[in-house]
Regions:
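The feature captures the ABC ATPase H-loop/switch
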Residues: 105
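Active-site-proximal beta-strand elements of phosphoester/diester hydrolases
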Residues: 195-199
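N-terminal beta1-alpha1 cap of cysteine-dependent amidohydrolase-like domains
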Residues: 1-101, 109-111, 117, 121-151, ...
Length: 235
């Protein structure tokens, strides 16, 4: 469809991960068209224009980027860190709608001057550290905002596939949701047109209406601001 906003979805190099397929479907169901961007292929898309961007999940963020220390469990993809940092900067400069998923939310926080917990497993007291794509954990609303407008509930079920989490909040962000251990589960910008970061993976939960609504809100904002599209920088 000609009126489908084009949404850039960042991810790692290599084979197509399951997360990309799930995110692509979520964007399609929301009325948009997803285009996969990686550190090695983004030059192929430099002539395209995007109306929104999703910073996807995946490997851990290099702790050196926020003054922390990596652990023995850290899986670092520095090339991706640097590529997505640049993409976030351009999206912020052009006021493009941004959704950060899991590591994407964490990286947005780091780009804005915040820090992360490198390993949250010792911080959990109320919930387990079991990683699962199924909605086995609970997020609780902390403040109103665009995420709560999308979720339309003060409590909802989430999945958990992470060891890192937001610690010190980045400039211009506010916390809008936490889990039962008070770890940050949702952030958004207090000034950007539409910037939301979620610590869970809504792309794996699109069989739940509340999770689909996150992508629908992103695509709606992209369509409203289609004139403010992002063209990737030339070399």
């Amino acid at each position: 469809m000609a009126d489908r906003p084009v949404v850039a979805v960042t991810g790692p190099d290599g084979r197509y991960p399951i997360a990309w397929g799930a995110t692509r479907l979520a964007v399609f169901l929301a009325g948009g068209t997803a285009v996969r961007l990686t550190p090695s292929n983004f030059r192929e898309h430099q002539k395209e224009r995007f109306q929104a961007i999703i910073i996807g999940g995946g490997s851990d963020i290099d702790a050196e980027l926020y003054g922390g220390e990596n652990t023995e469990h850290s899986r670092i993809d520095l090339e991706r860190d640097l590529f997505e940092t640049e993409m976030i900067g351009h999206a912020l400069d052009t006021n493009l709608p941004i959704l950060g998923i899991c590591r994407g939310a964490q990286l947005i926080n780091v780009v804005l001057g915040g820090s992360l917990f490198s390993d949250i497993r010792l911080l959990r007291e109320q919930t387990s550290n079991r990683r699962t794509p199924f909605p086995r954990k609970t997020a609780i609303a902390e403040s109103n905002g665009v995420l709560l407008d999308a979720i339309d509930s003060d409590q909802w079920r989430i999945n958990s596939l992470h060891y890192q989490a937001i610690d010190r909040l980045g400039e211009g962000l506010k916390v809008v949701a936490r889990d039962l251990d008070s770890l940050v589960q949702g952030v958004e910008s207090i000034s950007h047109r539409w910037l939301v970061g979620v610590q869970w993976h809504p792309e794996y939960l699109i069989y739940l209406k509340r999770q689909r609504r996150i992508f629908r809100h992103l695509v709606c904002r992209a369509r409203e601001g289609a004139a403010e599209s992002l063209k990737l920088p030339e070399d």
